């Protein structure tokens, strides 16, 4: 689905989106001035009550068997527990030469707001501020069944920290977590997490960090 404007207007709108995302990345600690992406990243998606794999598959554009491949704990793809995290693969691109991420096209439903899309549909993998800046609708007046752009940051790692990891998880922090709990949950040394995320506050209860995974 495309935005119903002329080709020239679509191109202008596209470049405005890229500019705003780059601007926001500079002020939000994203990885800037990339040369290339790394093909694959994982999103740590917190499954909310009533969510299922069909929904997750649809918004990320990935087939269910591909998602299950990265989640050995899922034994029944027709039914998954809520209040757990699952890993969702997505391509980690160098967007406009500026930063690493991937822009998904999400089709709105009745009652959507930027806050709801960020916190529920995309499980805090992005935030309301970003969505508001790179899309043209008012935050609480979004039409039904229109495409909006949702950008999720990713990481290809840092060779100066370690070259042992080629796959990284975009991990939204939740209330009650800290460096030790994230390290224990993900099976990664706390010191390594800190080095891959300099300046990150793991106890903030919000925001994202990048967790190395073998790949």
Language-model regions, residue ranges each:
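A mid-sequence interfacial segment
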Residues: 10-13, 142
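Extracellular LysM carbohydrate-binding repeats and other cell-envelope/extracellular binding modules
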Residues: 30-39, 63-101, 127-163, 190-215
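Sec-dependent signal peptide recognition
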Residues: 12-22
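Primarily a LysM-type cell-wall glycan-binding module
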Residues: 31-63, 90-127, 156-192
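N-terminal signal peptide
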Residues: 2-7, 20-37
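Intrinsically disordered, low-complexity regulatory segments of nuclear proteins
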Residues: 8-11, 84
């Amino acid at each position: 689905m495309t935005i119903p404007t002329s080709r020239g207007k679509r191109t202008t709108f596209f470049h405005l989106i890229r500019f705003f995302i780059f601007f926001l990345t500079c002020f939000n600690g994203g990885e800037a001035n990339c040369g290339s992406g790394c093909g694959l990243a994982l999103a740590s998606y917190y499954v909310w009550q009533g969510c299922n794999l069909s929904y997750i598959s649809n918004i990320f554009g990935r087939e269910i068997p591909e998602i299950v491949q990265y989640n050995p704990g899922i034994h029944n793809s027709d039914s998954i527990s809520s209040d757990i995290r699952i890993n969702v693969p997505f391509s980690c691109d160098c967007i406009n030469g500026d930063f690493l991420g991937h822009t998904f096209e999400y089709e709105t439903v009745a009652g959507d707001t930027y806050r709801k899309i960020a916190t529920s549909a995309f499980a805090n993998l992005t935030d309301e501020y970003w969505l508001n800046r790179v899309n043209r609708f008012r935050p609480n007046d979004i039409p039904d069944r229109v495409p909006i752009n949702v950008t999720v940051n990713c990481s290809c790692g840092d060779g100066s920290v370690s070259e042992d990891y080629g796959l990284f998880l975009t991990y939204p922090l939740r209330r009650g977590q800290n460096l030790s709990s994230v390290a224990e949950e993900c099976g990664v040394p706390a010191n390594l997490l800190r080095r891959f995320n300099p300046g990150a506050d793991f106890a903030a209860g919000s925001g994202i960090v990048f967790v190395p995974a073998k790949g």
